[in-house]
Amino acid sequence: LENTNHNYTIVQGELGTKLFLQTLMNQTSVCFDTETTGIDALNAELVGMSFSWSKGEAYYVPFSENRDEAQALVEKFKPFFESETIEKIGQNIKYDLKILSNYGVSIKGKLFDTMIAHYLINPDMRHNMDVLSETYLKYTPKSIEELIGKKGKNQKSMRDVALEDIKEYAAEDADVTYQLKQHFGPILDKAETKKLFDEIEIPLVPVLAAMELEGINLDVPFLKEMSVEMAKESAALEQKIYETAGEKFNLASPKQLGDILFDKLKIGGTKQKKTKTGQYATGEEILSYLANDHPIVKDILDWRQMVKLQSTYIDALPNQVDKKTGRVHTDYMQTVAATGRLSSNNPNLQNIPIRTERGRLIRKAFIARDENYTLVSADYSQIELRIIAALSGEENMIKAFQNNEDIHKSTAAKVFNVPLEEVTKEQRSHAKTVNFGIIYGVSAFGLSNQTSLSRKESAELIDAYYQTYPKLKSYMSAQVDFARENGYVQTVLGRRRYLKDINSANMMVKSGAERNAVNAPIQGSAADIIKIAMINIHKKLTSENWKSKMLLQVHDELVFDVHHSELESIKPMIKHEMETAIAMDVPLEVELGEGKNWLEAH
């Protein structure tokens, strides 16, 4: 900053603010940024706001520590924020939306988020402002650490920083973000992702902000009970493992565990994988592969799962309840998963394990607002399979979906060449594994690991599968060819996934990119579809003044807090909006459930 021409001004006093507002209201496109007392938007207070609408020029408006005075100043800026004609630019603008919402301001008009723009341009890169500025503007902004120090107990608050220093830092943020917008706008147009940006990603920002501010109710006493139970169970299992091993050892130490399993108990023969440091590898993948070789392996996997559940969810969730609201507020991130799917943090809802009984129980802790509300879960049924059927134009699969057949049973009947009514449970289960595995490039080796089939039987099953659905095979090859030629693949709505390794000389790396060439358009299309549904449902809930709220989005599922008086009218609305989010040759199907808690509803 010191070596760059810039003109940053502090806006103060009644007259200064009035004159500034007159100029501000005459602009058509303005970048703004809030400076606050912390990163938790629910509890942070405004320290200041910066604005920029021209390169090298920016303004900083400081806010009083007195809440009433700060609120009075915010009110003066309401006409700007609520103007439909002025475009507002920001970097991670969802945070600013949440801060302003706490001051009773709802932002209207067109939005532009540089972080999201860059995510669509280059999903695999980092998207924070400093990186973007250095990469695209060849300019290094002041770091927050220069102002308040490193994270930790000695870190200062923004309130403690001298006005002149905070002005330079905050105004620079707005200036840099404004310049990034000028840079990214044309690139978005060229990459043909502007429609996705304008119609899905940007309209989704206020939807996610509303969901995050709403939060969800948590049954803390239930989790405390579960914690005591889980501690007992894992301690008992630990003792059992020591008895089987014939000695006590540190279960959490991969080295000690490797020595016990492979030197002492000689599990899995002599060819055991070692890490760079020379100790045995004991990761989940390796142990899962050996699970049938010795009972101790299954117990160790079980014990690990219990310990992880307890530390990551059962004991952590109660600490994530906000003191002010008494609810848990997850943070949704739009710019992390390269496929276009949302991810979440604090808590990470996407990773709550649902394949095991214990993992599913954690959902029981998420409960309705009070006795007047019920949780409703709406889940897309087999959305990825429906998408690949539509994209590949595979008639056999499309017909099965159109006739509302059980797709796994229907696949089994065709693959094993038996009448539909004679398909066994086991045949259906094998067909299901292939159906879901095929888009992730499942191999005969992988299939035999997941089922009771031998490798030879698995290879035969995969061959029969491709003969049953020949267009799937040709679609998958065409996707890989397209990626080889263009360096990217795209979703139904034009979301791109760049695959720089698609022509790599390294076979492992190349086959990973080939798998992505097939599954990125499918996962990404599923992500686009649920995002459209969320935008449309949110629009209805707010414009029609429903009491019910949308709370969570996890994978292909949406969770709502529904007022009893609205239960029967909201369910068909949700189902309709989700099933008609996008028109395809294959019908989308949504399953609805309801209950006092998320487990019951799902």
Tell what function each PLM region has.
Residues 1-65, 72, 82, 91-93, ...:
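Conserved "right-hand" nucleotidyltransferase catalytic core of DNA-directed polymerases
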Residues 2, 29, 36-70, 377, ...:
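Metal-dependent catalytic core segments for phosphate chemistry
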Residues 70-72, 253, 565-572:
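Short, conserved charged micro-motifs
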Residues 101-111, 125-130, 394-398:
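A short alpha->loop->secondary-structure connector
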Residues 106-122, 404-408:
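Conserved beta-strand -> loop -> alpha-helix junction used to position metal-binding or nucleic-acid-contacting
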Residues 156-159, 206, 213, 322-330, ...:
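Conserved catalytic core of nucleic-acid polymerases
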Residues 250-252, 549-554:
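Short beta-strand
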Residues 468-470, 576-584:
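A common structural junction motif
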